[in-house]
Swiss-Prot record:
<dbReference type="GO" id="GO:0006357">
    <property type="term" value="P:regulation of transcription by RNA polymerase II"/>
</dbReference>
<keyword id="KW-0862">Zinc</keyword>
<dbReference type="InterPro" id="IPR013087">
    <property type="entry name" value="Znf_C2H2_type"/>
</dbReference>
<keyword id="KW-0805">Transcription regulation</keyword>
<keyword id="KW-0238">DNA-binding</keyword>
<feature type="zinc finger region" description="C2H2-type 3">
    <location>
        <begin position="290"/>
        <end position="314"/>
    </location>
</feature>
<dbReference type="InterPro" id="IPR036236">
    <property type="entry name" value="Znf_C2H2_sf"/>
</dbReference>
<comment type="function">
    <text>Transcriptional activator. Activates the gene for selenocysteine tRNA (tRNAsec). Binds to the activator element (AE) motif of the selenocysteine tRNA gene promoter.</text>
</comment>
<feature type="zinc finger region" description="C2H2-type 4">
    <location>
        <begin position="320"/>
        <end position="344"/>
    </location>
</feature>
<dbReference type="GO" id="GO:0045893">
    <property type="term" value="P:positive regulation of DNA-templated transcription"/>
</dbReference>
<dbReference type="GO" id="GO:0008270">
    <property type="term" value="F:zinc ion binding"/>
</dbReference>
<keyword id="KW-0010">Activator</keyword>
<dbReference type="Pfam" id="PF00096">
    <property type="entry name" value="zf-C2H2"/>
</dbReference>
<keyword id="KW-0804">Transcription</keyword>
<feature type="zinc finger region" description="C2H2-type 1">
    <location>
        <begin position="230"/>
        <end position="254"/>
    </location>
</feature>
<feature type="zinc finger region" description="C2H2-type 2">
    <location>
        <begin position="260"/>
        <end position="284"/>
    </location>
</feature>
<feature type="zinc finger region" description="C2H2-type 7">
    <location>
        <begin position="410"/>
        <end position="433"/>
    </location>
</feature>
Length: 623
């Protein structure tokens, strides 16, 4: 235990070491302890050592700061001649917590520090004044409050072990002890450390810092309430934060330190913050405490941030604007904006290291999804009983969920019609309202992926390049309101409409690679799009086998079987040639079931109806 006594009348200071070998202590007047006493104009830096006299009393030897401490080193057991002629010897004094022997802390104020140590502030209690509290910023960055007493003595004691509760049970703390430990709120003034000089603030009194000899003396920080006074010293950074804690968390982004580890069996992921770990644990527990309050939405999320981003899909709020002049686009999240900005700069910082690949990506999510093409990994599985479909992308899984739900989250702002997929909405707006305004990918928020799986809004599909992240694809052709379209429909249900000009640019055929590695080729000539009697399409498999796929017209039966073994398991192909769209489903046993829909086609609705037909049911067209 270290006891420091300050006598303000004489400016003298006394330190006593009672928990180990006698040690020298230096009082360095700098930053952390604030004492509002305008009568103190200066204070000398001194070094003191406790000695025990032969009669059992204790004396203190003061060393002049102008003399080297090593020249006055006093060892335990050494006999010292005092000024009055008596002899004294240096002796270790044990600290007794139970009273009787040693020093007892009477009438003290307890301060629990962040590093586990306990500080006690003692003063005569007969002049206790609630309004006399002064803020104390400790060396570890914490803030405590002490009461300044106008009497001649104030004692600050720091005990290396023990807690406040220990002393309370022993009856050593007075009932009038002040409760402390508030957050940072004191205004500090920078002073030179180690000079022994006292720095005076504008109105805050004297600033002091107690430094044990041998410790480094750090430059103090200046903090004003509400200001960002903590600066990151990492080269090229310089970000400011309001508290030392926030700065410490930020610095982990430079050091890579992740002290929070998931203890779930087989996981072991690490995180830089406790909040990040807490959010991650919910992926194991399934807890989603943050629920959307929008009527008929029913979505829940693991974090408040995910809920906030999802809510913007209802409100249309896009607070994050692109800073590039002439762009004018805005986004629901800062991360989407960051990825979008790379479409202006051309930056693609994520490179595939696989041999003979060399692809680069603007977002980490697309990079991770691409790498699964090389590894074959499909970690995201549909949990609906009997489905068990797997996907390389988290977002693809959530978009797939519309197959199993009646929800239609995407609505037309012109007529109010609702759709399950944003691609279907886009086609409706182009054909029915001549609205060619692109629909932002970030609006696909109903099944919104978590923050680490946000799709790259800058990822563009081109007519001549098919994104190889999609696994397998299907083709649809439709004639709506006199306009011809061909749509590439990926396995997860997303759809990209191609014009005839796009088709011509692609050449004579459309070749698709399924997730099993087989190839399906479909002719892309104009005759395919004609409504005048083209009721079948030739499909060619990888081994050269050809087969005719029938197109069911409105006056035919609800389904029709056509021979052929070229269709792969669970592949869906949509072909429409009449003003009343028809959807063709290829089942796992090679049976082709065509379902006519009364409204604009939806691949998911067709699959649902066709599945019921395959099971022997005869659902109506409005099912």
């Amino acid at each position: 235990m270290l006891l420091a006594q300050v006598n303000r009348d004489t400016q003298g200071m006394e330190f006593q070491s009672v928990d180990g070998d006698p040690q020298q202590v230096t009082l360095c007047l700098t930053e952390a302890v604030t004492v509002a006493d305008d009568n103190i104009d200066g204070m000398d830096t001194v070094s003191l050592q406790a000695v025990t006299l032969v009669d059992g009393s204790t004396a203190y030897i003061q060393h002049s700061p102008k003399v080297s401490l090593t020249e006055n080193k006093i060892m335990e057991g050494q006999v010292i001649q005092l000024e009055d002629g008596s002899a004294a010897y240096v002796q270790h004094l044990p600290m007794s917590k139970t009273g009787g022997e040693g020093l007892r802390l009477e009438d003290g104020q307890a301060v629990q520090l962040e590093d586990g140590t306990t500080a006690y502030i003692h003063a005569p209690k007969e002049t206790y004044d609630q309004g006399g509290l002064q803020a104390v910023q400790l060396e570890d960055g914490t803030t405590a409050y002490i009461q300044h007493m106008p009497q001649s003595n104030t004692i600050l004691a720091i005990q290396a072990d023990g807690t406040v509760a220990d002393l309370q049970t022993e009856g050593t703390i007075d009932a009038e002890t002040i409760s402390v430990l508030e957050q940072y709120s004191t205004k500090m003034e920078a002073t030179e450390c180690g000079t022994g000089l006292i720095g005076r603030g504008d109105s805050d009194g004297v600033h002091m810092q107690i430094v044990l000899q041998g410790q480094d003396c750090r430059s103090p920080r200046i903090q004003h309430v509400g200001e960002k006074a903590f600066r990151c010293e990492h080269e090229g950074c310089g970000k400011l934060y309001t508290t030392a804690h926030h700065l410490k968390v930020h610095e982990r982004s430079h050091t890579g330190d992740k002290p929070y580890i998931c203890d779930h069996l087989g996981c072991g992921k690490k995180f830089a913050t406790g909040y990040g770990l807490k959010s991650h644990v919910r992926t194991h527990t399934g807890e989603k405490p943050y629920r959307c309050q929008e009527l008929n939405c029913l979505k829940s999320f693991k974090t408040s941030g995910d809920l906030q981003k999802h809510t913007r899909t209802h409100t249309g709020e896009k607070p994050f604007k692109c800073p590039f002049e002439g762009c004018g686009r805005s986004f629901t999240t800062s991360n989407i904006r960051k990825v979008h900005i790379r479409t202006h700069t051309g930056e693609r910082p994520y490179y595939c290291a696989e041999p003979n690949c060399g692809r680069a990506f603007a977002s980490a999510t697309n990079y991770k999804n691409h790498m699964r093409i090389h590894t074959g990994e499909k970690p995201y599985v549909c949990t609906v009983p009997g489905c068990d479909k797997r996907f390389t992308e988290y977002s693809s899984l959530y978009k797939h969920h519309v197959v199993h739900t009646p929800c239609k989250p995407y609505n037309c702002n012109h007529c109010g019609k609702t759709y399950k997929q944003i691609s279907t909405l886009a086609m409706h707006k182009r054909t029915a309202h001549n609205d060619t305004e692109p629909i932002e990918e970030e609006q696909e928020g109903y099944f919104e992926p978590p923050a680490e799986a946000i799709d790259d809004p800058g990822l563009m599909y081109t007519p001549s390049v098919v994104d190889d992240d999609s696994g397998s694809e299907q083709v649809s052709g439709s004639e709506i309101m006199g306009q011809h379209h061909v749509a590439l429909i990926s396995q997860d249900g997303t759809q990209q409409v191609l014009s005839q000009a796009d088709m011509q640019a692609m050449g004579g055929t459309i070749t698709m690679v399924t997730q099993e590695g087989t190839t399906i080729t479909i002719p892309a000539h104009e005759a395919m799009l004609s409504s005048g009697g083209a009721h079948s399409v030739t499909m060619v498999s990888a081994d050269g086998t050809e087969g005719q796929v029938a197109i069911v017209t409105p006056d035919l039966a609800a389904y029709q079987t056509e021979e052929g073994e070229l269709i792969q398991d669970q592949e869906q192909h949509e072909v429409s040639t009449s003003p009343h769209p028809v959807t063709l489903l290829a089942t796992s046993n090679g049976t082709h079931i065509a379902v006519q829909l009364s409204d604009h086609p939806s691949l998911e609705e067709a699959i649902r109806i066709a599945s019921r037909i395959q099971q022997g049911e005869t659902p109506g067209m409005d099912d």
